C-alpha cells in the first residue's frame, strides 16, 4: 500500500498543473449531471475526495456552506488551492487525506463527492465504506469514475491499457461491482448513469507525460484491440488526430439512516 501511495504521489505530483488545466477534468456532461441530481443545499458541508485539480470542489462551493477538498498528493492540493483561490473562493479548505482512511469523524458531512479518481484507490470497497462512515444519516454520496464492460477479458484489456499509460492506475470496475460496493456499505442507490467521452489520444497521453516509445505501444494496443475492447474504446482517426472513447459511471446514493 505504501508503494502504491508513493507511486500515486509521484505520478500526480509531477503532473499536478496539467490536471488543473485539463479540459477533460475541468468540465463535462457527467459533472453537470452530478450537480443536477444532487441538488446541493446552501447549509451543507461537503467533502470532495481526491479533488485533483479542484474542479468538482469549485463546481459545488458556490452552492453550499463549505467544501473540504482532499487529496493524497500535496502538490496536487497546492495546485488546486492556487486555482480555486484564484477564483476568489473562500469557503473551500484543503486537507491531505487517503480516500480509504479518511481523517474525519463519523457523520460529519451532508455530501461526499469523488470524481474520476477511484481507479487509483487500493480498495474501492473500503473507500465506499469510508464515504458512508463520514456521511450523516440520510447524506448523499456522488461518485464518477471510469467504467469497464462486464466481460472480464475486455475489462482486463482496458485496465492493462490504462495502466501502461499510468502505472498508478489500479483498476476500473464494472457497474455490477460498483453497485455491490455501495449496497454493501449501506447505501440506497438513487441514480446511476453512464457517459461515453471522446479522448484526444495525444492530450490523454500528455497528461502523464508519456514518452514517444510508450505512445507508439499505446497506439498499437488501441488499433489491435480484440473485438470487445475495440467496441468499447472505438478508436478512430479524425482530421489527422487519433481519438478513442472511455466510459464513465455516475452513482448517486443515500446513506440509509439505519446503517451503523
What spans do the regions from the language model cover?
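Conserved class I S-adenosyl-L-methionine
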Residues: 1-44, 55-59, 76-79, 86, 140-164, ...
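Class I SAM-dependent methyltransferase SAM/SAH-binding core
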Residues: 47-101
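Conserved Class I S-adenosyl-L-methionine
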Residues: 53, 124, 190-260
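A short acidic, Gly/Pro-enriched loop at the edge of an enzyme's catalytic core
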Residues: 100-111
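A short SAM/SAH-binding and catalytic strip from SAM-dependent methyltransferases
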Residues: 110-123
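A short glycine-rich, Lys/Arg-flanked "PGG" loop and its adjoining helix->strand segment in the class I
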Residues: 125-140
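Short alpha-helix
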Residues: 171-185
Amino acid at each position: 500500500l505504501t508503494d502504491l501511495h508513493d507511486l500515486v504521489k509521484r505520478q500526480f505530483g509531477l503532473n499536478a498543473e496539467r490536471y488543473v488545466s485539463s479540459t477533460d477534468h475541468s468540465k463535462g456532461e457527467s459533472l453537470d449531471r452530478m450537480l443536477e441530481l444532487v441538488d446541493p443545499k446552501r447549509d451543507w458541508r461537503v467533502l470532495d475526495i481526491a479533488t485533483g485539480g479542484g474542479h468538482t470542489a469549485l463546481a459545488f462551493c458556490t452552492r453550499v456552506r463549505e467544501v473540504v477538498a482532499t487529496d493524497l498528493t500535496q502538490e496536487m492540493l497546492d495546485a488546486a488551492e492556487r486555482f480555486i483561490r484564484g477564483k476568489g473562493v473562500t469557503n473551500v479548505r484543503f486537507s491531505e487525506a487517503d480516500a480509504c482512511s479518511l481523517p474525519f469523524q463519523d457523520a460529519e458531512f451532508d455530501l461526499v463527492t469523488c470524481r474520476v479518481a477511484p481507479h487509483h484507490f487500493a480498495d474501492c470497497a473500503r473507500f465506499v465504506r469510508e464515504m458512508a462512515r463520514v456521511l450523516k444519516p440520510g447524506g448523499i454520496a456522488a461518485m464518477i469514475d471510469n467504467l469497464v464492460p462486464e466481460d472480464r477479458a475486455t475489462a482486463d484489456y482496458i485496465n492493462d491499457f490504462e495502466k501502461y499509460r499510468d502505472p498508478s492506475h489500479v483498476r476500473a470496475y464494472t457497474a455490477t461491482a460498483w453497485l455491490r460496493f455501495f449496497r454493501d456499505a449501506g447505501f440506497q442507490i438513487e441514480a446511476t448513469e453512464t457517459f461515453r467521452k471522446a479522448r484526444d489520444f495525444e492530450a490523454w497521453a500528455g497528461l502523464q507525460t508519456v514518452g514517444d516509445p510508450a505512445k507508439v505501444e499505446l497506439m498499437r494496443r488501441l488499433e489491435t484491440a480484440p473485438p470487445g475492447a475495440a467496441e468499447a474504446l472505438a478508436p478512430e482517426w479524425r482530421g489527422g488526430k487519433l481519438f478513442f472513447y472511455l466510459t464513465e459511471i455516475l452513482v448517486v446514493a443515500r446513506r440509509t439512516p439505519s446503517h451503523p
